[in-house]
Amino acid sequence: MSSHGKPTASPTVSCAKIDIFIMPNLATWIREKDEKWFQPFFDKHPDIRICGARKGAVALEEMDGLLLTGGSDISPEFLRQEVVDPSVLDKDVDLARDRWEFEAIAKILTRGRPILAICKGLQVFNVALGGTLKLDIKGHNLSEQKDHDVQPLRNDRAARHRFAQVNSSHHQAIDRLADGCEVEAWCATDDIIEQIRLRDYPFALAVQYHPERGKIYDALFDDFFSRVREFAKSLNRSIAQ
């Protein structure tokens, strides 16, 4: 209202909208002795924050992806089968890690975030979704098989990532495949499942072999990290400024 009693127009204020991009967060649990294998891939993607649950609490609701890595056998209490001979299982199971990983899978899946599971990670992923394991594979015991052992693969033609040979060292493997999963690769010599994916899900790939131990797997990691970025970007919000 002016001094003469007449209304005056309010000044026009324009609000520009800007996009806020938050650094992508990747949740994982990596044994100290395995960090050297993963660090080169992390260094190649410095824009992604690695949140290691072994070193401290991780807010899973803030994560944009999940990386499951190798380790000791799954604690028996999480297995969906009877353990007839407990002596075949590792004595150094990590109960705290298993609890975290099973919880992480459940929460990450409900939010559609990308998942890459490696070695034990594949086994945890399969069990978490309802599958079972071969608890001890003859000829695959760690005392019999070295980290540099190479296995030939049979690949499904539909698999996005296909390798003729892989570095695969393990004494357990998938027995009954979890519902909703598809096999993408088998060991050519004994039909052990080496690679699976979750159907009707943006990106959930699990491999029995060790892609962290070779440059030939760069494309697999690049694909995974790009999915983590894309998911984080999809959550961006415009705010008035």
Residue ranges: model-predicted function:
Residues 204-209:
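Active-site-proximal beta-strand elements of phosphoester/diester hydrolases
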Residues 1-120, 126-134, 138-159, 163-165, ...:
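N-terminal beta1-alpha1 cap of cysteine-dependent amidohydrolase-like domains
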